[in-house]
Amino acid sequence: HLQIPNHLLEELSVVHPQDIHMNAVVIFQAAQGMEQSGWIRLPFCNTLLAEALGATPTLSVAGARIKEPAFAKPEELMTIQVQETARLCAMFEALAQLSKAGKKVAYNIEGPLTLLCALLPMNKVFSALRKPVGKQMLSQVEEWIVRYAEMAVERGAKIISFADPIATVDILGSQMFVNQYVPCLLQLLIRLQERFPDTVIHLCGKLTQSLIDTKQCTLTRWEGQKGQSYGQTLTEFCGEGGIVGHYCLNYLGASRNYLELIDFTEKRNKNER
């Protein structure tokens, strides 16, 4: 996850975790201090949505971690709704203020499996995926992520960035990745694109690579102006909407004047047959 540098924590007099996790003004200032190549990235940890669904994170000034899953079995997840926790409210208040100040924000959201593994023991997630309850579980996680993305876009996020470190071919195996994970991801992306046609969706490099390796998508290169950084190229593209990826937002300042557009049309057509 994105980490606030120590010098910035000192400048902002952040001593206790609450100073950065619960204070929209400090989040706003920290985010501005970390702007790179015209972009601000939020949030500073990957536990906000899990917490809004019932997980209990351990907070530190460096971020937040979930040590113990809040639930024991998939059936317990089926009626849960996203709650507006104090941390979520502070983060979204900062996001709204940054957008109001004319800043461009890329908002990171955990993908379906990483989110589920923050709520349930990992072995329960994987065993559920092999059973009928797995389909229900993935459908439920899709609802949560769409709702969370809506909350971010409504407050001005220009890019929704997806990372799902647990969802790689190496971890899942190609059969589970292609047959269970990809349909869920595809449905999620279709819904987000329909709901927010002008918002760019950025898939992390590892997830894109797994999609390429299993022939689930095709890539098209989109060229920006010469000599630009990756961040500047994203700015030029922004507003066009679409899914981009095969690269990492950690490298916004890197020299890269093109984007890789991700197309699932062939996969979508096969599913509809």
Summary of predicted features, one role per range:
Residues T56-M151:
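Active-site-proximal, glycine-rich beta->alpha crossover segments in alpha/beta enzymes
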Residues Q32-G33, E150-E154:
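Non-catalytic positions within long, well-ordered alpha-helices that form the structural scaffold/packing
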Residues N46-L48, P112-T114, P165-V169, G205-S210:
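Short, internal active-site loops enriched in acidic
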Residues W39-S60, R65-E84, I159-F177:
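Glycine-rich, proline-tolerant flexible connector loops at the mouths of alpha/beta enzymes
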Residues N108-F126, R155-Q180:
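Active-site-proximal loop/short-helix segments
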Residues I40-P43, A106-N108, A157-D164, D198-C204:
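Short beta-strand segments at enzyme active-site cores
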Residues H1-L59, V178-V200, I212-R273:
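N-terminal basic, low-complexity leaders that serve as flexible interaction/assembly modules and, when applicable
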